């Protein structure tokens, strides 16, 4: 079994007002910096890039950053909301490998509110290029499209491991009440992979 040596954590989208508001940027918000620190202290090189204009995301701009980082069979991918959708589009269209893919509150934009950003076809062949796909979602998530995205992902990737919560909303700091996300860390380092 190969050990994870690298991780890429991708934040989700936000509204323009939130982007320009004082406070941490998207890549330094919610549980992302905490998870990055936890992985780094375990010897896993971890990147949390600031994706351009998350309030009006353009796939080609986000892809450029992902291409610079690269991925392989030892790379762990974690995406929150539309960040997970972007990671999935990237590894699908580029036919890339990864060790495990963790999609937290996965959002594939089923109603196309973000234009062509996540306009791609899911491909079951992705399963053959990754060790595991994990879907983490909460029954009380109020973001439109998450439930539909989870259903679509579960249909295309029937072997994906689903981790359903009841009270985590969209997994933001306001939903979790903390910057920590120990359940995700345990899945990554603990073994349910």
What are these regions (language model features)?
Residues 142-148:
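Conserved alpha/beta-hydrolase "acid-adjacent" motif
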Residues 168-179:
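Catalytic histidine-centered segment of alpha/beta-hydrolase-like enzymes
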Residues 12-13, 51-54, 102-111, 138-139:
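Active-site nucleophile loop of the alpha/beta-hydrolase fold
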Residues 49-51, 163-170:
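Short glycine-rich catalytic loops that host catalytic nucleophiles or stabilize transition states
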Residues 77-88:
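Gly/Ala-rich beta-loop-alpha elbow adjacent to hydrolase catalytic centers
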Residues 129-130, 134-141:
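Short beta-strand/loop motif that positions the catalytic acidic residue
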Residues 106-129:
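Flexible "cap/lid" loop of the alpha/beta hydrolase fold
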Residues 2-42, 50:
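Short, surface-exposed "cap/lid" segments of acyl-processing enzymes
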């Amino acid at each position: 079994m190969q050990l994870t040596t690298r991780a890429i954590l991708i934040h989700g989208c936000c509204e323009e007002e939130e982007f320009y508001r004082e406070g941490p940027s998207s890549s330094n918000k919610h549980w992302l910096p905490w998870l990055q620190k936890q992985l780094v202290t375990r010897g896993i090189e971890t990147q949390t890039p600031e994706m351009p204009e998350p309030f009006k995301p353009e796939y080609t701009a986000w892809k450029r950053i992902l291409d610079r980082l690269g991925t392989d069979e030892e790379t762990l991918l974690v995406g929150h909301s539309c960040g997970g959708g972007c990671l999935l589009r990237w590894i699908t269209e580029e036919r890339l490998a990864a060790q495990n893919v963790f999609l937290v509150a996965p959002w594939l934009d089923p109603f196309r509110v973000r234009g062509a950003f996540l306009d791609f076809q899911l491909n079951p062949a992705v399963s053959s290029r990754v060790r595991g796909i994990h879907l983490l979602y909460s029954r009380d998530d109020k973001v439109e499209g998450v439930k539909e995205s989870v259903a679509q992902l579960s249909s295309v990737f029937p072997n994906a491991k689903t981790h359903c919560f009841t009270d985590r909303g969209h997994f933001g700091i306001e939903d979790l009440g903390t910057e920590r996300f120990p359940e995700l860390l345990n899945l990554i380092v603990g073994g349910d992979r």
